[in-house]
A protein has these predicted regions:
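ANL superfamily adenylate-forming
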Residues: 25, 32-84, 190
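Conserved pre-ATP/AMP-binding loop-to-beta segment of ANL
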Residues: 52, 57, 72-91, 98, ...
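Gly/Ser/Thr-rich phosphate-binding loop
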Residues: 148, 173-178, 187-257, 270, ...
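Short beta-strand->loop structural element characteristic of the AMP-binding/adenylate-forming
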Residues: 1-27, 101-103, 152-158, 228
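Conserved beta-loop-beta connector loops within the AMP-binding
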Residues: 268-291
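Conserved AMP-binding/adenylation subdomain of ANL enzymes
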Residues: 110-127, 135-175, 189-190
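Hydrophobic alpha-helical segments in the ANL/AMP-binding
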Residues: 1-5, 14-15, 116-118, 137-149, ...
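Conserved AMP-binding A3 loop
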Residues: 87-111
Length: 298
């Protein structure tokens, strides 16, 4: 079961997550991360093997990724996967205490892919730009949704506005997932953003915060594509609510307040706003968001 690590966390936070998840194997890229792991290796209780990609073979404890692969069996594992098997464990920071590990099952991920694709229909063939960090729920739904329809994933390690714009224009990208701040950065900091042609770009999806009407309108004018929004959290794979491209057009043309909404509940999902005693609240009241659906973690 993979456990993606946020590379921005402190070493001791890494140690906590690695131990709490009972991980047996660590795979890192490059010497920077292998050096950091070596500094905490004495604290790691369950790790049996350390693997590094692009290693210069001089780091203690670490084995080369490709050597490790070549030594592995070509036989299909004698394992029958069912809907209740774990797919991954992703850590999310709570309001207090240590990060919490959300365990997502095969049925959770499959359900959320179906919900995502039902509201935000992807073009076929599909080719997505994955620039959201891969320890984040947004990256998971972007990646899994594309894989589910046999699409291609183009990965960029870091968010660099010029690189993102160039990729959207030149790599036949059909869709991507960004946050509004990333969209805004592409619009204001890339000199050629408006002069490029984005002939294959069909959709940009966003989340994490509302998008300003002026940002959305400018993005629609520049990229000439549809926009969709997802709202959710790590514990729900990715989304519990979605706002369709049609609703974004309506927001721009007649009702900008729609952009303050997190969208409508995904199919097979119940969403309520409740008070501290779990009582449902009327429209317009502030409370806690409660959700029930097949995408919720076990």
């Amino acid at each position: 079961v993979p456990v993606p690590l946020n590379y921005r966390l402190a070493d001791q936070e890494w140690a906590y997550i690695i131990n709490d998840s009972e991980a047996k194997l660590i795979i890192v890229k490059g010497n920077e991360y292998s050096d950091r792991i070596n500094q905490i290796s004495s604290e790691l209780k369950n790790i049996k093997k350390y693997i590094s990609i692009s290693l210069d073979n001089s780091i203690e404890k670490f084995h080369d990724f490709y050597d490790w692969l070549s030594d592995s069996s070509n036989e299909k594992p004698a394992l029958k996967i069912d809907e209740n098997y774990d797919v991954y464990q992703m850590y999310t920071s709570g309001t207090t205490g240590h990060p919490k590990g959300a365990v997502l099952l095969q049925r959770n991920v499959a359900a959320n892919i179906r919900q995502y694709l039902n509201s935000l229909t992807l073009p076929r063939p599909s080719r997505t730009l994955l620039v959201a960090p891969m320890y984040h729920a947004a990256a998971m739904i972007n990646m899994c949704g594309c894989i589910a329809i046999g699409g291609t994933i183009v990965i960029q390690e870091d968010f660099i506005p010029q690189d993102v714009v160039d990729c959207l224009a030149n790599e036949k990208i059909t869709h991507t997932v960004l946050v509004p701040a990333m969209i805004q950065a592409c619009l204001v900091s890339v000199p050629n953003v408006a002069s490029n042609e984005y002939n294959d770009l069909d959709q940009i999806h966003y989340g994490a915060s509302p998008i300003a009407p002026e940002t959305l309108k400018k993005a629609m004018d520049v990229f000439k594509c549809k926009f969709g929004q997802g709202f959710g959290m790590t514990e729900t794979v990715a989304v519990i609510c979605l706002m369709t491209p049609e609703e974004h057009i309506r927001a721009i043309e007649e009702k900008p307040d729609l952009l303050k909404s997190c969208g409508r509940p995904a199919i097979d999902t119940q969403v309520e706003i409740r008070d501290e005693n779990e009582n449902p609240l009327p429209v317009g009241e502030i409370g806690q968001i409660c959700a029930k659906g097949p995408q919720i973690m076990k």
